Amino acid sequence: MATQADLMELDMAMEPDRKAAVSHWQQQSYLDSGIHSGATTTAPSLSGKGNPEEEDVDTTQVLYEWEQGFSQSFTQEQVADIDGQYAMTRAQRVRAAMFPETLDEGMQIPSTQFDAAHPTNVQRLAEPSQMLKHAVVNLINYQDDAELATRAIPELTKLLNDEDQVVVNKAAVMVHQLSKKEASRHAIMRSPQMVSAIVRTMQNTNDVETARCTAGTLHNLSHHREGLLAIFKSGGIPALVKMLGSPVDSVLFYAITTLHNLLLHQEGAKMAVRLAGGLQKMVALLNKTNVKFLAITTDCLQILAYGNQESKLIILASGGPQALVNIMRTYTYEKLLWTTSRVLKVLSVCSSNKPAIVEAGGMQALGLHLTDPSQRLVQNCLWTLRNLSDAATKQEGMEGLLGTLVQLLGSDDINVVTCAAGILSNLTCNNYKNKMMVCQVGGIEALVRTVLRAGDREDITEPAICALRHLTSRHQEAEMAQNAVRLHYGLPVVVKLLHPPSHWPLIKATVGLIRNLALCPANHAPLREQGAIPRLVQLLVRAHQDTQRRTSMGGTQQQFVEGVRMEEIVEGCTGALHILARDVHNRIVIRGLNTIPLFVQLLYSPIENIQRVAAGVLCELAQDKEAAEAIEAEGATAPLTELLHSRNEGVATYAAAVLFRMSEDKPQDYKKRLSVELTSSLFRTEPMAWNETADLGLDIGAQGEPLGYRQDDPSYRSFHSGGYGQDALGMDPMMEHEMGGHHPGADYPVDGLPDLGHAQDLMDGLPPGDSNQLAWFDTDL
């Protein structure tokens, strides 16, 4: 190791060389600066003399770090030589940085840049000058292009109109080249004569190259609003539509992209394309296989069809639904699938296109993409499926779609859950296979969980409750479904939905579900314990009062509140109480609410379904002696006897059963006369002994068929964009048909309700009569 004395001796020996190096740097320049004025700055130097603050710098450390940065060492002579080279080439380095084009070709200039990631000061200072130089050059070129085009346009316009097709072709090529540069492109679009000549040439030529160049020129012009207007004013749209029939792919591409730009940004373009027959041409192009071309074409169709019924019908007549469904079934390119799903969404609100899409397999094709990573594609498919689903209740092969929809109920996206619930509601209506499939894949549990999570979001709870209502009746798994709602803790939340803030559409659906749940004896006690019976009576009283009030005012039309007829609520609540009354404890609660006078009054209703459910609940209540006596005391014998002659077998049978039970304590003679009357009324076509009927009417509907929801026209609200108020079968059956034969409608009492004891208290918390209807309206959005 060197001693202190050795180091001092070495330092003294190097002192003259160090001073000489510093003097040279001050006279010339530091090897890494390239700037003469560097000597007058206070930038630190290797000697440390240039900055008084660094007099105490450890030079050994500096030398150590310097050595670490290089793989070889330099002698003082070599350093001096390199320093001299840098000083001699300083001007060349500055010129190379700022004006590289002025250097002689092949000239080598030593660089002062040690690290490629860190530019030198000269290089950094040169950047603005380079940018300025390029800007000036571009400006000169732009001006040259503009001047050249301005001078050439009149002559090129004449050449495009020449009779010699060779001349026309050459002119078209030149115009196409000019349109690629911005300055000349602006000059072209500012010449109406030139644009008209381009359009005319494109439309009339038989030469492929000429067509390609002219179409390409219009495509270039269409990237500017001024160009779009020029094309539009020159009659370019009919010509471009004609080009959609070209056998040349490049011409097709130019034509469709130019039309797409026009449709997006040029006012009046949509009508012009429709009038030129563009829709038919575009639908015919859907059999192409270029996915990017198809994406632009389908987007054009969406723009044209949106909000225009005539366009939707033209697409239908041209075979559009089948072609669009084929695309959804065939391709995987996300943008194409998205644009195609947008067209289908627009068409799915058209009553004519809807069945065509369904018949083409649209439900299954759209269902293929519900698990796609693209959320915009999934959402469009769901919206379209929701719109189509009310027309797809008879479709086969829906197993995969149903399973996916049940899974989507667990999504955190509210829009996804809303659509999935609405689709399931429609697809489970009147389709026992779909009902069984949904039950088998855990649909009951998923729907109950959805209702629990939704809270008071009725756009989710209403379709979910309707789906549960469908799943709990009229199929082999119905009893399992009725039990499953209870086992998955659904009864409390279902009963809760009968209360505020629920609106009438949701209340109607919930009443129907409770009626179905009551078909399962195991649900009788839990429903009673949750307070379902008093709330049903409360709703019944309110709805009946509304119908009475309207009748007393001379109204003949059925009253709608939030899209629901109050007669539907009367029928639904009475029907639910009818099934609940099969349980002896429930009968006691129902009778204790002083409902018998109201049920007797309902026997006078002009609506057959209300007559039937009223007679049905009285039939159940009449099993108890006290109730039978109360029914008779309310004067039920007269209306029941009248109803024996009803042409509705359900009404007549229930009426007979009530009369029969009311006669159990009567003298034998009365029983005999009644038996004759019942036999003659009930068995007019097939006379038989009364005692052969056993328990007539005691279990009508026991197979799980809600008496108010017939197989051919269930109480069903379609969840598609047409709104809650539209039914899949075109009618709402709960109160649709009046009794065909004689009925006591003229004597229907309109005086006040019998005293229910707690009627006023029951009125609190009912939905308002004038709330806005909750519905999805028919829209392309």
UniProtKB/Swiss-Prot annotation:
Residues 156-178 are annotated as: Interaction with BCL9. The modification N-acetylalanine is found at A2. Its main location: cytoplasm. The modification Phosphothreonine is found at T41, T556. Glycans are attached at S23. It is found in: Cytoplasm; Nucleus; Cytoplasm, Cytoskeleton; Cell junction, Adherens junction. GO terms for biological process: adherens junction assembly; bicellular tight junction assembly; canonical Wnt signaling pathway; cell adhesion; cell-cell adhesion; cell-cell adhesion mediated by cadherin; cellular response to growth factor stimulus; cellular response to indole-3-methanol. ARM repeats lie at residues 141-180, 181-223, 224-264, 265-306, 308-349, 350-390, 392-429, 430-473, 478-519, 520-582, 583-623, 624-664. Residues 772-781 are annotated as: Interaction with SCRIB. SMART domains: ARM (SM00185). Residues 2-23 are annotated as: Interaction with VCL. The modification Phosphoserine is found at S23, S29, S33, S37, S45, S191, S246, S552, S675. The keyword Cell membrane applies. The modification Phosphotyrosine is found at Y64, Y142, Y331, Y333. Keywords: Acetylation, Activator, Cell adhesion, Cell junction, Cell membrane, Cell projection, Cytoplasm, Cytoskeleton, Glycoprotein, Membrane, Neurogenesis, Nucleus, Phosphoprotein, Repeat, S-nitrosylation, Synapse, Transcription, Transcription regulation, Ubl conjugation, Wnt signaling pathway. Phosphorylation by GSK3B requires prior phosphorylation of Ser-45 by another kinase. Phosphorylation proceeds then from Thr-41 to Ser-33. Phosphorylated by NEK2. EGF stimulates tyrosine phosphorylation. Phosphorylated on Ser-33 and Ser-37 by HIPK2. This phosphorylation triggers proteasomal degradation. Phosphorylation at Ser-552 by AMPK promotes stabilization of the protein, enhancing TCF/LEF-mediated transcription. Phosphorylation on Ser-191 and Ser-246 by CDK5. Phosphorylation by CDK2 regulates insulin internalization. PROSITE patterns: ARM_REPEAT. Residues 734-745 have a biased composition (Basic and acidic residues). GO terms for cellular component: adherens junction; beta-catenin destruction complex; beta-catenin-TCF7L2 complex; catenin complex; cell cortex; cell junction; cell periphery; cell projection. CDD domains: CTNNAbd_CTNNB1. Two separate complex-associated pools are found in the cytoplasm. The majority is present as part of an E-cadherin/ catenin adhesion complex composed of at least E-cadherin/CDH1 and beta-catenin/CTNNB1, and possibly alpha-catenin/CTNNA1; the complex is located to adherens junctions. The stable association of CTNNA1 is controversial as CTNNA1 was shown not to bind to F-actin when assembled in the complex. Alternatively, the CTNNA1-containing complex may be linked to F-actin by other proteins such as LIMA1. Binds NHERF1. Belongs to the beta-catenin family. Key downstream component of the canonical Wnt signaling pathway. In the absence of Wnt, forms a complex with AXIN1, AXIN2, APC, CSNK1A1 and GSK3B that promotes phosphorylation on N-terminal Ser and Thr residues and ubiquitination of CTNNB1 via BTRC and its subsequent degradation by the proteasome. In the presence of Wnt ligand, CTNNB1 is not ubiquitinated and accumulates in the nucleus, where it acts as a coactivator for transcription factors of the TCF/LEF family, leading to activate Wnt responsive genes. Also acts as a coactivator for other transcription factors, such as NR5A2. This is Catenin beta-1.
